[in-house]
UniProtKB/Swiss-Prot annotation:
Active site, renumbered: K66
Catalytic reactions of this protein: a 5'-end diphospho-ribonucleoside in mRNA + GTP + H(+) = a 5'-end (5'-triphosphoguanosine)-ribonucleoside in mRNA + diphosphate
Enzyme Commission code(s) on record: 2.7.7.50
Subunit-structure text: Heterodimer. The mRNA-capping enzyme is composed of two separate chains alpha and beta, respectively a mRNA guanylyltransferase and an mRNA 5'-triphosphate monophosphatase.
Keywords recorded for this protein, A-Z: GTP-binding, mRNA capping, mRNA processing, Nucleotide-binding, Nucleotidyltransferase, Nucleus, Transferase
GO biological process: 7-methylguanosine mRNA capping; positive regulation of transcription by RNA polymerase II; tRNA processing
Name by which UniProt lists this protein: mRNA-capping enzyme subunit alpha
Organism: Candida glabrata (strain ATCC 2001 / BCRC 20586 / JCM 3761 / NBRC 0622 / NRRL Y-65 / CBS 138) (Yeast)
General function of this protein: Second step of mRNA capping. Transfer of the GMP moiety of GTP to the 5'-end of RNA via an enzyme-GMP covalent reaction intermediate.
Length: 449
């Protein structure tokens, strides 16, 4: 087990009637036919060797670090009755949390005072809550790293390409927020946490991004590759959105079931039901169950010392199947007992040792109701066996860059030819590619308060 800590949403979970109204609003912002019962955010797929040529070489991609935090959408909306702005966080279980204390302004049109007078309304952002270490105070701080924008002030962006969505996020949301904090710091002193845009590099800069992972103020466990020109995939797996992890970081979320051994007491009569009893002094078997789909209900116990009874196991096995056993040392078992927390039925994130094949626990995932679906587990196992290394990715960089340049030059030649033939305006000069700089994942001067 490692020391990873999942951040908690600093908000109040909303009741059903409020949540339903908010889901209807999100449905409208996403241009969806009906409100989603599940998390509306897109989900990446595990990276495989074939993705290098079939995807990274075939089309333009952004690359960024894969933050090891809590994935949440952020909805900013103005109450039509009270006129007050509300900020809501949507977690992976599609729960809505009201986070008080923020003010998110619109981009000023004439004067800076508009930062205090205007409010974002109908803005939906995708990002990750993360715990960062402040280099000045050495204290842990909560921050929201934004990496996509699904709607801005009531205008849906899900059909726009990623490049356009990021431009809207930067100009229409992040800039006025950052200007507000810069010009009126006293007005922002009680904000629950800070926000930053996650830096996006071009895919051929993947080595530079990978080399920066251990220098970040938060935990990062890999890379995310996002296609530049595709729309946002609402509420499900996006086969073009790729997550790469080093072999040792590829993990699976299982449901943990403790199988407490039973011991026979020969001093008790054979027909006495007390002859066999659960031996709580012995270390149990730590069974890992994989989710088959469907609702998981009534299977979490309140006391880690109590095993599942027959009825609870029958309920569990309608949606879960025993998959493997977790390797826990005696020392680790003592650590778990010392927590004095319920263990049965919790979701645990585990990694597989490539040499021994045993599963080891990274941490509890209490932000998840269910473990990974069996199809996801299979993909992760394929990714582990396929084992794309950073060296494999590095070797592909020249081919990725060459293909990128060919597409850029081809687009320019087509663009230039079209204008030349129409004679509507003089021949355009090629747009210089932005010089790549060192990744700036958070604002360098944004640690002071």
């Amino acid at each position: 087990m490692d020391a990873r800590i999942s951040p908690e949403i600093p908000g109040i979970i909303q009741p059903g009637n409020v949540t339903q109204d908010l889901k209807m609003l999100v449905c409208k912002l996403l241009n969806s036919p009906k409100p989603s019962k599940t998390f509306p955010g897109s989900q990446p797929v595990s990276f495989q060797h074939s993705d290098i040529r079939d995807k990274l070489v075939a089309q333009d991609y952004y690359v960024c670090e894969k933050t090891d935090g809590l994935r949440v959408l952020m909805l900013v909306v103005v109450n039509p009755i009270t006129g007050e702005q509300g900020c809501f966080m949507i977690d992976r279980e599609n729960n809505y949390y009201l986070v008080n204390g923020f003010h998110f302004p619109r981009l000023p049109q004439k004067k800076k005072e508009e930062l205090l007078e205007t409010s974002q309304n109908g803005t939906l952002i995708d990002g990750e809550l993360v715990i960062q270490k402040n280099p000045m105070t050495k204290l842990q701080e909560l921050r929201y790293l934004m990496f996509d924008c699904l709607a801005i002030n009531g205008r849906s962006l899900v059909q726009s390409p990623t490049s356009s969505r990021l431009a809207h996020l930067g100009k229409e949301f992040y800039k006025p927020y950052y200007d507000l904090r810069s010009i009126y710091p006293d007005k922002c002193a009680t904000f629950p946490f800070k926000l930053s845009m996650k830096h996006m590099d071009f895919s051929y800069s993947l080595v530079k991004v990978a080399n920066s992972l251990d220098k970040l103020p938060h935990l990062s466990d890999g890379l995310i590759f996002t296609p530049v020109r595709t729309p946002y995939a609402v509420g499900g797996k996006d086969s073009l959105l790729l997550k790469w992890k080093p072999e040792q970081e590829n993990s699976v979320d299982f449901k943990l079931i403790l199988e407490i051994p039973m011991t026979e007491d020969n001093s008790v009569a054979k027909k006495d039901p007390r002859r066999w009893y659960y031996n709580y002094d012995a270390k149990p078997t730590f069974a890992l169950y994989v989710w088959q789909g469907g609702s998981d209900v009534n299977t979490k116990l309140q006391n880690f010392e109590q095993p599942f009874d027959k009825r609870e196991m029958q309920v569990l096995e309608k949606t879960y199947k025993r998959f493997a056993e977790l390797s826990i040392s005696d020392e680790q078992w003592q650590e778990l007992k010392n927590l004095e927390e319920p263990l049965n039925g919790r979701i645990v994130e585990c990694t597989k040792d490539p040499e021994t094949g045993s599963w080891t626990m990274l941490r509890f995932r209490d932000d998840k109701l269910n473990g990974n679906h069996t199809s996801v587990v299979q993909k992760v196992l394929e990714s582990i066996s396929d084992s794309v290394t950073i060296d494999d990715l590095a070797e592909s960089v020249p081919e990725i860059k060459s293909a990128w340049d060919e597409r850029k030059n081809g687009a320019y030649q087509h663009h230039s030819s079209s204008f030349s033939e129409s004679r509507q305006q003089p021949k355009a000069e090629p747009v210089a590619e932005k010089k790549q700089t060192e990744p700036k994942y958070v604002d360098d001067d944004d640690w002071s308060d």
